[in-house]
Amino acid sequence: AERANARLAASGVPGRIHLRKNNRDAEGNGFGCHENYLVRRRGDFWNDARTLVPHLVTRQILVGAGHIAGDGDTRPAGNGLRDLRDYVFSQRADQMWDAVSSATTRARPLINTRDEPHADVEHYRRMHVIVGDSNIAQGSTLLKVAAMDRRLDYLEHGGDLSDLALADPMRAIRDTCHDMTGGVLLERSDGRTITPLEMQAEHLGRLRDHVAQGIEVTALHEAALELWERGLQALRLQQPEIVDTELD
């Protein structure tokens, strides 16, 4: 953009070019940031997909790109929907309407379950996540991808996250998005409540325990786990300067 603006100025052309990276246009139409993870073909793919939902609902407190909600943004309010105009965690959260589905344009799910592995179909499936924001900070992308990679590895090693299931993921993703403290109470399927901060901390703790059992991890994975912890600390203490050069 800077080079283009320099050429415009040198040519005497008025105006200025701005480059933006987002997941929605001025009319509120959305477009996804797609993440694709290669997973082993197992009989419990659907269970794994549903197990990932609480993380995908709440990870926006760390890797959301931020958004000023305006016209076209709605969330449940009583028996209807109300317009919102405030700063929120994620551009995508208010546009998602299902947890897992193969109907990506009609239902806008967190996870697209169509069986399109783009690999050896006998051995692999694709975990296709479409709820994420388009990030600019490299740290955000690292944390977003590495956290999912570790979580999928945890599940493939027999880990269980089903006890953290949410009663209403679509309400939870909106409530999480619009509470910038990370402290809103989300109802779990077992009737108990948990905050997005607590949900992310619980996931991080289980993955750290998993790694401590001797699971091989790369330096990037270690960096992501450390950034994850500092990101939660920054939100818990309301001190964004702890990670303000690393996360969007």
Residues covered by each model-derived region:
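Active-site acidic/histidine clusters and adjacent loop/turn architecture
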Residues: 1-20, 186-230
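Short, flexible coil/linker elements and helix-boundary hinge sites characteristic
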Residues: 12, 158, 214, 236-239
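Loop-rich catalytic cores of soluble enzymes, especially ATP-dependent carboxylate-amine ligases
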Residues: 15-26, 31-193
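Low-complexity, intrinsically disordered regions enriched in charged/polar residues
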Residues: 46-50, 83, 105, 201, ...
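Substrate-recognition/cap regions that form aromatic- and gly/pro-loop-enriched pockets
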Residues: 226-248
